[in-house]
């Protein structure tokens, strides 16, 4: 899989925001982790934080993760904003780049 820049990931997600909202009920989506910190390597996955209009079924959540992987051509670690534990939440919310 080819590595993308943060800007390319943002651009792809932005271009598909309407579909993400309509098909998956995504209210807010952003990138955090190694891509935001400029530490991503060839084998890095992309960490994506998502907030839904209503909590999806597990099947729908997995479907979204697979959709994003196909869209970006990268492995995706999808994290629900509502499931962040307080210890890590501060770090994630400080570095997340929303699109």
Swiss-Prot record:
Mg(2+) 2 binds at residues 45, 47. Its cofactor is Mg(2+). It catalyses: L-tyrosyl-[protein] + ATP = O-(5'-adenylyl)-L-tyrosyl-[protein] + diphosphate; O-(5'-adenylyl)-L-tyrosyl-[protein] + ATP = O-[5'-(adenylyl-(5'->3')-adenylyl)]-L-tyrosyl-[protein] + diphosphate. Binds 2 Mg(2+) ions. The active site is at residues 45, 47. Its EC number is 2.7.7.108. CDD domains: NT_KNTase_like (cd05403). GO terms for molecular function: ATP binding; metal ion binding; nucleotidyltransferase activity. Keywords: ATP-binding, Magnesium, Metal-binding, Nucleotide-binding, Nucleotidyltransferase, Toxin-antitoxin system, Transferase. A motif (GSX(10)DXD motif) lies at residues 33-47. InterPro entries: NT_sf (IPR043519), Polymerase_NTP_transf_dom (IPR002934), Type-VII_TA_antitoxin (IPR052038). It is an enzyme of class 2 (transferase). Gene3D superfamilies: Beta Polymerase, domain 2 (3.30.460.10). Mg(2+) 1 binds at residues 45, 47, 77. The keyword Plastid does not apply. Belongs to the MntA antitoxin family. Antitoxin component of a type VII toxin-antitoxin (TA) system. Overexpression in E.coli neutralizes the toxic effect of cognate toxin HepT. Neutralization is mostly due to AMPylation of the toxin by this enzyme. This is Protein adenylyltransferase MntA. It comes from Thermococcus cleftensis (strain DSM 27260 / KACC 17922 / CL1). The lineage of its organism: Archaea, Methanobacteriati, Methanobacteriota, Thermococci, Thermococcales.
């Amino acid at each position: 899989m080819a590595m993308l820049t943060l800007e390319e990931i943002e651009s792809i997600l932005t271009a598909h925001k309407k579909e993400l909202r309509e098909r998956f009920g995504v209210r807010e989506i952003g990138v955090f982790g190694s891509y935001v910190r400029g530490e991503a390597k060839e084998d890095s996955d992309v960490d994506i934080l998502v907030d839904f209009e209503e909590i999806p079924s597990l099947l729908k959540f997995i479907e979204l993760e697979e959709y994003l992987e196909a869209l970006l051509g990268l492995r995706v670690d999808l994290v629900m904003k509502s499931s962040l534990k307080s210890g890590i939440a501060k770090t994630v919310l400080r570095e997340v780049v929303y699109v």
